[in-house]
């Protein structure tokens, strides 16, 4: 340990005293930057409502309409929650999937990073983007989060420019405060949130509350705001936010609003959840002997576990900050092998929806579906030859899950098409597909069962009839299992009803009429063995059956099972459980998985959730019943008094009993048989006309700061002095504007020195709409410097005018090829400091140049001036004087930097930089 400390000390000492004469340009302020790659052309349209606009591309009309309908209901609710009315119109930008958003330029910072972030004011806070993941519940949560974000920003920072400039420079909120509040408002409390809160509380990861970052900060903040709401009431939250704006501080606002300091509240918050979860460990312990990996990495998310038909191999996916890898684990040798690695670790929203894995029934081929270059690709990996075959999978926006038929000629999948998540069957030989469902219900986890004659899947559909219009208007409050008769193509699904307000996912056929499923019946997502059965419902001319499912718990874990997989041929089951901040994978034989766990007591949240959802369901049924009766009265033409239908006139038929929830539909059908009705389609009522988006610019940011650097990188003209001129203290002002999608950006800047002798002006215009990014930069710089000629000092003022055309071609998000064409004019003026220089002629030089760069940059920001990762560039430049002289200059250089995080706010930075020049006007390096 002592030797290691000495080694680190010597390395630090070496770097401290290392000569830095290899600096060029502005030294450390080299231009790097990440990219957005456009693979598709999007044409944007929008709906305009009173309080919001919704922009969508040519493939997203259905999503935009769903967004509009939900937003019209949600804005008034959130305005009541925050006790604040929106002053600024919300601009929604709807993407069909996250991969489409990654092609956009929204949020992209081009050029060099801001090294001096003081005085930077962001203006636009009302523009939000949302994307569809295949689950409308998550989509609605995104919409709610977007509205809440805009409302909170307006309360804190105001909506006028003067308020933004004043408040944004003074209010700096921790991540747990802002993002935690947005998460609480948008997601409420659910089984997945509680699972992570419980894990963080019991494993003491949230002990240092104010030091949390990333997901831990969001989840801890979410639970903190729930504690505030449960203890003091939700009505205090708007007061806390308002006091935050007044006091410009996130600590004192709690003291003024609640009478307790944030420190005291954090203790009370921790005690509150420790008391709730004190009995949480009274469950089966997680299996220790069946772990696939003894200690998985904390930063990695493990998912898509899949067991091969022979039981020898287990495939799974790891995802770390957006970079995913597919692994093959040999259960006989306990060795793992990486098949592919895709994408990079970047500071962006991670898409966990792909890749999706499935084994071919032969056991010799592992297949997986990914999203690449804006499209969907299906890969076949042959274990024997290690060959990788790829096919494009067209006509779908996203594939969420899939599985093969017994003979491997078909696979059934859950896919997104036109904003709807439905079930499809794909024929591999012909490349065609058959659509099974087509509605707004969310259909997940399809599997072939019963010798591939039927398909079981999980869905929140209200009606069990395919094509029923009610599934487009109403969804169930939980997910049930449904069976589709694929052999006969029956449009009536078989619903495997269990508990009314419990959800069941990921069904796998154990044997005939028995399944492994995941369910949240107890408040913790455990595995159940579900048996499908039927009983006689009633008899008329034929026997009618009612189908149901009975289940018993096979696990009683203290944490949720995130996902599981069962292979009937192998007789093995795999599962992933999140515990102690890690994702643990397990592999069990069937006989162990079938052991009954005993009776599971529901958690406190399960009881509260069931009560709340039952009340909501009852109110919704009453509301819809009233609407249905009113609709009959409004839309029915009564032909005679005798046609009037009285509900009480009908007797109960014991052979055809009508349940309460079906009564109103039954009566409606009776009325329709006896009356002429006018069906009024009100779906489009009140929908504004579609408008075409025209490019318009919005003010984006303002910079007002004291600075010590130049606006633009540029070689300085040599004036005979031995000093590289630095501008010293100066006043910097920059303003940026861009269009709605950040495709076009205009930036203007001015730097003024105190003596007005060394000033600088810059204007930049960028076009990022296509894959080839284009930029025009005009830069004017003047500086005063001294020189020496034959022992006599003189003073010169140099004026440089530079026009650059920059073309940037991105290979992916981190690699790019940059070419720059430059025209430059230097004018050197000798100041009349004495008689010798009074009549000395000015020197004019005009240059034409070209610069080529290869740039790699995968750094992530851990904070202000705290990068983590690697960035480097290779560059070459060639300049030629074009105004009569024959001076030329050629430059080659490299700049390599690697940043390593060694503590929360401490990094180890390594840099290697080198440059050389050739020609008649060589560079002078200082």
What is the predicted function of each stretch?
Residues 463-467, 471, 560, 772-819, ...:
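Outer-membrane beta-barrel translocator/channel fold
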Residues 78, 173-193, 198-260:
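Active-site-proximal alpha-helical
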Residues 22-167, 174, 191-192, 253:
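Juxtacatalytic substrate-recognition/specificity segment
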Residues 783, 793, 840, 847-926:
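C-terminal outer-membrane beta-barrel translocator/porin domains of Gram-negative envelope proteins
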């Amino acid at each position: 340990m002592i030797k290691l400390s000495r080694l680190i000390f010597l390395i630090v000492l070496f770097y401290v005293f290392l000569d830095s004469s290899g600096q060029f340009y502005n030294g450390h302020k080299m231009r790097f930057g990440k990219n957005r790659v456009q693979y598709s052309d999007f044409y944007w349209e929008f709906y305009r409502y009173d309080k919001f606009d919704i922009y969508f591309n040519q493939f997203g009309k259905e999503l935009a309409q769903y967004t509009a309908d939900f937003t019209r209901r949600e804005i008034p609710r959130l305005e009541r929650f925050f006790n604040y009315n929106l002053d600024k119109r919300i601009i929604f930008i709807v993407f069909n999937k996250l991969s489409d958003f990654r092609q956009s330029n929204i949020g992209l910072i081009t050029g060099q990073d801001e090294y001096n972030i003081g005085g930077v004011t962001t203006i636009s806070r009302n523009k939000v983007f949302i994307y569809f993941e295949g689950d409308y519940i998550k989509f609605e949560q995104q919409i709610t989060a977007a509205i809440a974000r805009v409302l909170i920003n307006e309360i804190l920072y105001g909506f006028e420019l003067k308020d933004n400039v004043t408040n944004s420079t003074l209010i700096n909120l921790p991540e747990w405060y802002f993002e935690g509040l947005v998460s609480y408002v948008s997601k409420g409390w659910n089984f997945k949130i509680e699972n992570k809160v419980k894990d963080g509380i019991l494993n003491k990861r949230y002990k240092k509350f104010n030091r949390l970052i990333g997901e831990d900060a969001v989840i801890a903040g979410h639970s903190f705001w729930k504690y505030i709401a449960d203890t003091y009431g939700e009505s205090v939250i708007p007061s806390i936010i308002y006091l935050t704006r007044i006091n410009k501080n996130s600590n004192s606002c709690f003291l003024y609003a609640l009478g307790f300091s944030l420190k005291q509240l954090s203790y009370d918050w921790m005690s509150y959840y420790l008391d709730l979860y004190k009995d949480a460990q009274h469950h089966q312990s997680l299996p220790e002997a069946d772990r696939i990996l003894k200690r998985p990495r904390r930063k990695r998310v493990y998912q898509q576990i899949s067991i091969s038909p022979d039981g020898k191999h287990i495939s799974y996916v790891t995802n770390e900050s957006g970079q995913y890898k597919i692994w093959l684990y040999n259960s006989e040798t306990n060795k793992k092998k990486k098949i592919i690695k895709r994408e990079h670790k970047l500071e962006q929203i991670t898409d966990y929806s792909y890749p999706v894995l499935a084994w071919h029934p032969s056991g010799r081929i592992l297949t997986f579906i990914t999203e690449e270059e804006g499209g969907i690709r299906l890969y076949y990996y042959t274990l024997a030859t290690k060959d990788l075959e790829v096919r494009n999978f067209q006509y779908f926006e996203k594939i969420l899950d899939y599985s093969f038929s017994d003979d491997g000629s078909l696979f059934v999948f859950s896919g997104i098409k036109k904003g709807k998540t439905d079930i499809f069957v794909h024929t591999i030989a012909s490349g065609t597909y058959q659509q099974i469902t087509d509605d707004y219900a969310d259909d997940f986890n399809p599997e072939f069962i019963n010798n591939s004659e039927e398909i079981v899947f999980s869905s929140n559909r209200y009606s069990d009839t395919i094509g029923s219009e009610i599934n487009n208007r109403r969804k169930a409050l939980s997910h049930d299992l449904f069976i589709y008769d694929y052999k006969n193509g029956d449009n009536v699904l078989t619903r495997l009803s269990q508990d009314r307000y419990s959800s069941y996912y990921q069904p796998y056929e154990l044997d005939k009429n028995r399944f492994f499923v995941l369910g949240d019946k107890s408040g913790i997502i455990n595995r159940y063995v579900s048996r499908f059965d039927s009983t006689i419902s009633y008899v008329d001319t034929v026997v009618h059956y009612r189908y149901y499912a009975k289940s018993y718990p096979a696990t009683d874990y203290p944490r949720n099972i995130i996902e599981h997989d069962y292979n009937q041929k192998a007789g093995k089951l795999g599962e992933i459980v999140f515990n102690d901040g890690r994702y643990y994978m397990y592999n069990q034989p069937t006989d162990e998985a079938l052991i009954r766990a005993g009776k599971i007591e529901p958690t406190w949240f399960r009881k509260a959730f069931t009560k709340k959802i039952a009340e909501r369901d009852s109110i919704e049924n009453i509301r819809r019943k009233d609407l249905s009766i009113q609709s009959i009265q409004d839309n029915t033409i009564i032909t005679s008094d005798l046609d009037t239908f009285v509900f009480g006139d009908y007797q109960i038929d014991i052979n055809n009993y009508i349940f309460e929830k079906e009564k109103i539909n039954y009566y409606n059908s009776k009325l329709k048989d006896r009356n002429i009705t006018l069906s009024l389609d009100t779906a489009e009522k009140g929908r504004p006309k579609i408008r075409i988006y025209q490019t318009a610019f919005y003010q984006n940011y303002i910079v007002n700061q004291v600075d010590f650097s130049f606006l633009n990188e540029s070689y300085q003209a040599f004036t005979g002095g031995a000093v590289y001129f630095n501008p010293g203290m100066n006043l910097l002002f920059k303003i940026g504007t861009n269009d709605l999608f950040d495709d076009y950006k205009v930036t203007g800047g001015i730097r003024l020195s105190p003596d007005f002798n060394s000033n600088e002006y810059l204007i930049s215009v960028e076009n990022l709409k296509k894959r080839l990014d284009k930029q025009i930069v005009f830069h004017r710089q003047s500086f005063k410097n001294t020189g020496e000629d034959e022992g006599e000092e003189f003073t010169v003022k140099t004026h440089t005018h530079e026009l650059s055309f920059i073309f940037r071609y991105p290979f992916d998000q981190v690699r790019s090829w940059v070419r720059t064409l430059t025209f430059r004019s230097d004018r050197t003026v000798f100041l009349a400091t004495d008689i010798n220089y009074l009549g000395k002629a000015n020197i004019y030089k005009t240059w034409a140049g070209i610069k080529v760069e290869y740039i790699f940059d995968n750094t992530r920001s851990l904070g202000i001036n705290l990068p983590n990762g690697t960035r480097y560039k290779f560059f070459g430049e060639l300049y030629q004087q074009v105004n009569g002289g024959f001076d030329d200059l050629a430059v080659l250089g490299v700049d390599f930097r690697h940043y390593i995080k060694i503590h929360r706010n401490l990094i180890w930075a390594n840099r290697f930089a080198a440059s050389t020049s050739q020609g008649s006007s060589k560079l002078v390096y200082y």
